[in-house]
From Swiss-Prot:
Cofactor(s), by name: FMN
InterPro entries tied to this protein: Aldolase_TIM, DHOD_1B, Dihydroorotate_DH_1, Dihydroorotate_DH_1_2, Dihydroorotate_DH_cat, Dihydroorotate_DH_CS, Dihydroorotate_DH_I
GO MF term list: dihydroorotate dehydrogenase (NAD+) activity
The encoding gene: pyrD
Organism: Pyrococcus horikoshii (strain ATCC 700860 / DSM 12428 / JCM 9974 / NBRC 100139 / OT-3)
Name of the protein in its database record: Dihydroorotate dehydrogenase B (NAD(+)), catalytic subunit
Length: 303
């Protein structure tokens, strides 16, 4: 009964809890995804998969800061064929959301069509802030967001989630464009544009010079984005950005998030964060007199 308190259903898919492993945190082997689930994740998102293999950027690709990370990985991935071959015979008892990226609507659609056999849903990486030609340039323009989402929905019946960038003046325009294109949900936010400089070397630390900032430092930005999106959209919002504790998780749920993705906290503290956060949410629900997590979603929108 206690476990059922955290159960959510999104896009017709059952998640035993709303805490989802975010894309790009761990290697995408089936074994590691199972480990994430066994240690408390309600579902997983794979690393972003592209049409061709990508090595990614040279080290250093991550800078640790007091309140998070700046990363510029460069979308390293084995390409769709190798990924499909690795996963095609695997069977999972939890939802696997496949993240895909491309430079055009046609590339996104191609990948969705090819990877449909191994995906319970797709997350469209429309918002990578450090990979030239992929993501950010597409994801900042509502027209492009609409076209990418529509192209993918035209070739697959699987649920489609548009991952939105915070690096715009009004994120709700992106969310509404995704909804018009047929998206089943949106996830927000991706990383915030950032840079770190070595004051002695007198140069940027990352090999790519610039990257994306994640972790506790962006939580208020992410929370505002979720709040704004949940007010205007009729599709679910998945909250991402700086969730490190059950209190953070509850804030996002109250702001209108139907589920949550956790990334940087897993990188810094390991998979144990899933059970820590789940246990904290359960205690909060009991103390506040709620029987289900569904009872608190969006309560802050009603005041």
């Amino acid at each position: 009964m206690v476990k059922r308190m955290l159960e959510v259903k999104l896009f017709g898919i059952r998640f035993e809890n709303p805490l989802i492993l975010a894309s790009g945190v761990v290697d995408m082997t089936p074994e590691l995804l199972r480990r994430a689930h066994n240690e408390g994740a309600g579902g997983v998102v794979t690393k972003s998969i592209g049409k061709e293999p990508r090595k990614g950027y040279d080290n250093p690709t991550i800078v640790e800061l007091p309140y998070g990370l700046i990363n510029a990985m460069g979308l390293p991935n084995p390409g769709w064929e190798a990924f499909l071959n690795e996963f095609i015979d695997e069977r999972f008892d939890f939802p696997v959301i496949v993240s895909i990226f491309g430079g055009t609507p046609e590339e996104f659609a191609f990948l969705a069509e090819k990877l449909e056999p191994v995906a319970d849903a797709f997350e469209l990486n429309l918002s990578c802030p450090h990979a030239k030609g992929y993501g950010m340039e597409i994801g900042q323009d509502p027209k492009n967001v609409y076209e990418v989402v529509k192209a993918v929905k035209d070739v697959t019946d699987k649920p489609v989630i548009a991952k939105l960038t915070p690096n715009v003046n009004d994120i709700t325009k992106l969310g509404l464009a995704a909804e018009r294109g047929g998206a089943d949900g949106v996830s927000a936010i991706n990383t915030v544009k950032a840079i770190a400089i070595d004051i002695y070397a007198k140069r940027p630390i990352l090999s790519n010079k610039v990257g994306g900032y994640s972790g506790p430092g962006i939580k208020p930005i992410a929370l505002r984005a979720v709040y704004d999106l949940a007010k205007v959209l009729d599709i679910p919002v998945i909250g991402i950005g700086g969730i490190t504790s059950w209190r953070d998780a509850v804030e996002f749920l109250l702001a209108g998030a139907s589920a949550l993705q956790i990334g940087t906290a897993v990188y810094l503290r390991g998979f144990k964060v899933f059970k820590e956060i789940s246990n904290g949410i359960i205690e909060y629900l009991k103390e506040e007199g709620f029987s289900s997590i569904r009872d608190i979603i969006g309560l802050a929108l009603k005041v």
